[in-house]
Amino acid sequence: MEKELNIDWANLSFGYIPTDYNVRCTYKNGEWGEIEVSSSELIPMHMAASCLHYGQEAFEGLKAFRGKDGQVRVFRMDENAKRIQRSAEGIMMPALPVEKFMEMVKMVVRLNARFIPPYGSGASLYIRPLEIGMSAQVGVKPATEYLFVIFVTPVGPYFKGGFKTTPYVITRKYDRAAPLGTGTFKVGGNYAASLRASCEAHAAGYSAEFYLDAREKKYMDECGAANFFGIKDNTYITPLSTSILPSITNKSLMQLAEDMGIKVERRQIPEDELTTLEEAGACGTAAVISPIERIDDPENNRSYVISKDGKPGPLSTKLYNRLRGIQLGEEEDVHNWNTIIEL
């Protein structure tokens, strides 16, 4: 008999809560096997597994939402399937077929349906796929065996304060990724490389660190673990860079901006251009949009105040509400981004 859940849905943090099941698929002898269901939170692993030594690990993040109509929707999972394929291929791992990825997502959501937060709680079911190199070896080369796992956990809003502006800080001491390195892939090493800068930013009272381009330290690159966008003159501007992870949320916001008659530009954004922005935000799966109050540059003793009244800008708010409305079934999904999971 299932144990009754004792979860305060309205006050969930963005953290890990154990659920009932995860799903797994093994790659060996040159092919993917059958999908397996597991109730264990542990992965048996050899101490010489390539993921532990040589960083053969890629992951994704997506969400399932219980909508206004009671239906469960997963947002743009085909895009996550394709992105983890690119990440895997970028570090010489086999790509899981899109169809198998989507089957695994549907399966794990159904198996853990009781953990999907209720509509109106502000919470969602976070879905974490990951692929890791499993074969034991000493020597830098791709593994021969891999494990693909998807687990889920209910999460609250990434930022407890909700949709409000927060400060960011430019760091020049660190680069998140090299211009032609692994920055465009969602691999663990990129996040390990950002931990020191992130911890220093948080300790100084900032929401996240802001990286400049690694080559010239002149252009805005990525803010923490999220993409950056600025708005001015009815134009949505986001960096074009070879070291930034292509955000599915940012891609969606660009489409919604065009739908609203807002011009979209993907180009380099010089730091000096921050003085002209009317609105700015960080965007990603976790927070959707985190509006930026100001961006400090302590090394040059400068502060770029984006939000003069301390509130999110009108277009950022409109884009946020539109995207959230689509995810929750409150607004028409004209681009067919959602997959409805039959429970």
Which role fits each region the language model picked out?
Residues 117-128, 132:
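Extended, Lys/Arg-enriched charged tracts that mediate electrostatic binding to polyanionic substrates
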Residues 1-108, 137-343:
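Helix-start/capping segments and mature chain N-termini
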Residues 114-120, 140-142:
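Short, charge-rich binding segments
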